[in-house]
Structures are given as C-alpha cells and as structure tokens.
C-alpha cells in the first residue's frame, strides 16, 4: 500500500509540474465552477446535452468507425443547440461477449487499440472546431463496456459474470469486490494515467489543453454494490480524482454517480463524496421506469407521477449539496416510447412530456446546472432487436434492446422539445 501511495504521489507531482508549464491556453474556453455555478467564457453555463457513448468508436477508422457520419451527427446536434456530449473513453475486456460493446479500447491491461485512441483524438478535434464540450468517462460499473468486471477478471477474481447470462444477483456478488480489490483498482489507476496524460496525435497537444473536454468522469454509474463497501468506494472515487487532478489541473472532475440510488440508498454517502474538494460538481441520474417509480400500465397515462418523483429526487440532492456550492448536472434521464415501441419515428407523446418537464426543471430554477438526455442515435437504424457486429451503434448499448431509449433524427416532436429547451439554455447563458 505504501508503494501504491508513493507511486500516485510522484505521478501527481510530475504531471502538476507539466501543467504549470503549459502555455498559450485561454482558461475562459474551459468550463469551471464559480460560486456554485458552472461557468464558460466568464458567463453562467446552462445546457441541454446528450449521451453518445459510442462517439470515439464512430470517430475511428477501424471497425464501427465512420468519420463522415460522426461529423454529420455532430453537425445535427450542434444545429439543435446540443453542444454537450457524455462519452465513453473506451471499453475494456474481451470481444464477442454477450451484452458487451465492440470494438474495445483495452483488450488486456495496458494494451490499447490505437485505432480507438486515434478516434478519440479525432473526436476532440471535431468538437473543438464546433465549440462543443465532452464529458469523458473512464470506467463503468456495468458489464456493457467491461469496467469493474474486466479489471476483476484481470486481477484474478475469476471469469467476469454477465447479468443476462449469469443472473443479476450473481453479477452484483462479483462486481462488489472491485472497490476492495487493490490489484483491480491499480490496473484502473494505470489506465487513468495513460488516458488523461495522452497527447492528441493530430494536434500534438496534450489532452489537458483541449477546451473540448468539460470534465473527466471517473465512471458510468459507479457503485459500491454493498453497504459494507461504501468506505472503500469513497476512497476509490477520491483516489481516482486525485490522480486525474495531478495530471490535469485545468479540467473539471466528476463522478458519474446516479445519486443515492448509486450509493446503496445513502444520501449521506453521495453528499460526502461530492462535497470533497477533489470533485468539482455533482451528478445524478434519473430512471423512473427502471427504478419502478411508475408502474408499467401507467407509463403513458400518468407521466405526471414520474415527473413528481423526479422532482423530489432532484430536490433531495440539491438540499443535501447546496451548502457546499457544488452545481448538479442530471446527466442521464430517459423515458419509453409510446406502447414500449423501439421503432425510429414511432410516437413519443409521453417521452416528450417527460423531456419537457425535466428541461423546464433545469431552466426555471437553480437546482440543476445542466441535463443530458439518454441517448442520441441520430441517423443510426437498428438492424436487430439486440446489437450484433457490425450493426449501427445506437444510443442503446449492447445490453439493451436497440431503440429502447434512443432519440433518432426522425423523432421530430422530441427534437422540437430538445431544440426549444437548448435555445432557452443558450439565452440563459448570455
């Protein structure tokens, strides 16, 4: 443990020195937090964003890549006023696994698919050209991109389990060991250092100087998966944050948390983590159907119930964190299509009502600084109910039915809701 702590400290000192030497960077181009508000170019920054987990894959020149399509999707989002994208840096572990996205970035510990890394480079260049921002998450507590389970398998914990194959309870029993496993965590810390310290192969500049990055995010929905693991979970989150800040002091650091639902229902745990100085702003996610706030048979007849439960969830977290002057971003929310359809262009009356409510909640008060809907699929069209190589990547990863929460470019009423809210957010930021 002393060796690990010493290694981390030396890395922090080394990369902090590099940061001091960086020149020619306008800090106003970077998102910051001032007095409890997100700021950009000296003005409050409120936004309507989206999730586009697959963007680095699409930006690559390998399997799954299509740079012309990427640019078209970015142009469409930019035209809607959606300039904030939450993106997976890359998947970990083996390929060809059930529920697992492909291609992967890190097939073995410390071994990288350079095609995906170069895709990430290209993506950041394209975002910079459009004045767009990215939240880049580095890990995942869920199986669809490897994450916890990949690191545990590499650390000798046994074969990674998959909920759809092995059962959800069995999966939880497996991944709850991540926050306790020193070897697995060190493998992840090595990955963090490798990615955050990277220089862009196109521009030659370190990632730390890219204004396209709003935030480095520790993971997608990080969890302890047990009450007993909460203390080690907190230390894992804050250790990762310290490593990131030691390499890149310019960009924000966030957790990717769902809120108390991701902290074993402990609001105290969520508050304690987000109040720490290593974390710049707070995250929550909201999933009314998944969390059973609303019954299946009232999903489309009682949207108001989902809205009220969502407001109460936001309020609880705002009340808990406001004394620490940390803004909250609702970075995932979603709602089913009418009649539980997955088809592009099918009716979205209930979804549109819910999106309108959430964006209004963000725009008409101080509880939320921004929101990212889940998820953008744009011109992609699912070829199968479950993703198969090499179908279009959609906003629904491989563990979900394709089209489940996707927003397609033919969902005109939903796009209208998004564009109107984004325009209001733009005016609020002037």
Protein language model regions, located:
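Positively charged n-region of N-terminal signal peptides that target proteins for export
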Residues: 1-6
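Boundary at the C-terminal end of the N-terminal hydrophobic targeting segment
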Residues: 20-24
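Active-site mouth of glycoside hydrolases
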Residues: 26-294, 301-327, 333-428
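Bacterial N-terminal signal peptides
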Residues: 7-16
């Amino acid at each position: 443990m002393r060796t690990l702590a010493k290694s981390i400290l030396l890395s922090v000192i080394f990369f902090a020195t590099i940061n001091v030497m960086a020149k020619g960077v306008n800090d106003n181009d970077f998102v910051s937090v001032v007095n409890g508000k997100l700021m950009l170019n000296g003005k409050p920054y409120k936004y309507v964003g989206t999730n586009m987990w697959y963007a680095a894959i699409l930006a690559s020149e390998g399997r799954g890549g299509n740079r012309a399509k990427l640019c078209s999707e970015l142009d469409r989002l930019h035209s809607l006023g959606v300039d904030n994208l939450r993106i997976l840096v890359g998947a970990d572990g083996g390929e060809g696994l059930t529920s697992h996205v492909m291609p992967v970035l890190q097939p073995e510990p410390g071994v990288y698919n350079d095609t995906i890394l170069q895709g990430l480079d290209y993506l950041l260049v394209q975002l910079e050209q459009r004045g767009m921002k990215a939240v880049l998450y580095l890990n995942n507590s869920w199986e669809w991109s490897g994450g916890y389970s990949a690191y545990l398998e590499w650390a000798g914990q046994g074969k990674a389990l998959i909920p759809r194959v092995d059962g959800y309870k069995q999966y939880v029993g497996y991944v709850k060991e991540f926050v306790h496993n020193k070897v697995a965590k060190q493998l992840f810390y090595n990955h963090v250092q490798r990615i955050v310290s990277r220089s862009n192969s196109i521009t030659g500049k370190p990632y730390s100087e890219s204004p396209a990055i709003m935030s480095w995010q520790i993971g997608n929905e990080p969890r302890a998966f047990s009450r007993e693991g909460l203390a080690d979970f907190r230390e894992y989150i804050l250790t990762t944050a310290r490593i990131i800040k030691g390499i890149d002091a310019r960009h924000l650091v966030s957790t990717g948390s769902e809120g108390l639902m991701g902290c074993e229902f402990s609001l105290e745990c969520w508050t304690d983590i987000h109040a720490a100085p290593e974390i710049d702003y707070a995250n929550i996610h909201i999933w009314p159907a998944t969390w059973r706030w609303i019954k299946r048979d009232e999903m489309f007849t009682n949207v108001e119930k989902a809205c009220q439960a969502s407001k109460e969830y936001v309020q609880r977290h705002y009340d808990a964190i406001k004394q620490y002057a940390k803004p909250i971003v609702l970075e995932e929310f979603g709602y089913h299509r009418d009649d539980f359809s997955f088809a592009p262009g099918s009716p979205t009356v209930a979804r549109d009502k819910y999106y309108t409510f959430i964006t209004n909640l963000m725009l008409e008060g101080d509880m939320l600084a921004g929101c990212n809907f889940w998820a953008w699929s744009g011109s992609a069209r699912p070829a199968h109910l479950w993703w198969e190589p090499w179908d279009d990547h959609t906003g629904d990863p491989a563990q979900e039915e394709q089209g489940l929460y996707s927003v397609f470019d033919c969902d005109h009423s939903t796009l209208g809701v998004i564009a109107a809210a984004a325009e209001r957010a733009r005016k609020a930021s002037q």
